[in-house]
Amino acid sequence: MESVRQQKVARLILKEMADIFLKESRVLFGNVFISITVVRMSPDLSVAKLYLSIMLQEDKNAILKEIKVHTKELRKLLGERIRKQVRIIPEIIFYLDDNVDYANHMDDVLSKITIPKKEDENFDPNQYPGLKE
């Protein structure tokens, strides 16, 4: 469980990095929409793990690699914004958050399931024992 301080610093980093990605991503990464879904801080506040959701792009891993190339530059921009609020600027580690893709996949799977209605002539109550009358 994260401490209150970890949560505060994580929220601060999320807010500032989201603003940095909003303003700088077009210059650095082209026409890609990058959002930060979660920030996790280490107990000593020296490492921030940022989970990114990358949209409008097919090859998300290529964009993630490009982001990792610019990690120093992004950390410098973050440091300029939060240096008076934290003692040390944390090391930034980026991860790809695939929860949105997984949710879309599960939505597709669930939409393909067809359960006949009780009024349907093909309905067999023995085939669906969990359904109540």
From Swiss-Prot:
- UniProtKB keywords: Cytoplasm, Ribosome biogenesis
This protein's record includes keyword Ion transport: no
Which Pfam families does the record cross-reference, listed alphabetically? RBFA (PF02033)
> Which InterPro entries does UniProt cross-reference here?
KH_dom-like_a/b (IPR015946), RbfA (IPR000238), RbfA_dom_sf (IPR023799)
What are the record's GO terms for cellular component? Answer: cytosol
What is its subcellular localisation? Cytoplasm
According to its UniProt entry, the protein's GO biological process terms are: maturation of SSU-rRNA
The transmembrane residues are none
Instruction: Cite the GO molecular-function annotations of the record.
Output: ribosomal small subunit binding
**Subunit comment:** Monomer. Binds 30S ribosomal subunits, but not 50S ribosomal subunits or 70S ribosomes.
| Family according to the record | Belongs to the RbfA family.
Role, per record = One of several proteins that assist in the late maturation steps of the functional core of the 30S ribosomal subunit. Associates with free 30S ribosomal subunits (but not with 30S subunits that are part of 70S ribosomes or polysomes). Required for efficient processing of 16S rRNA. May interact with the 5'-terminal helix region of 16S rRNA.
The name of this protein is: Ribosome-binding factor A
Q: What is the lineage of its organism?
A: Bacteria, Pseudomonadati, Bacteroidota, Cytophagia, Cytophagales
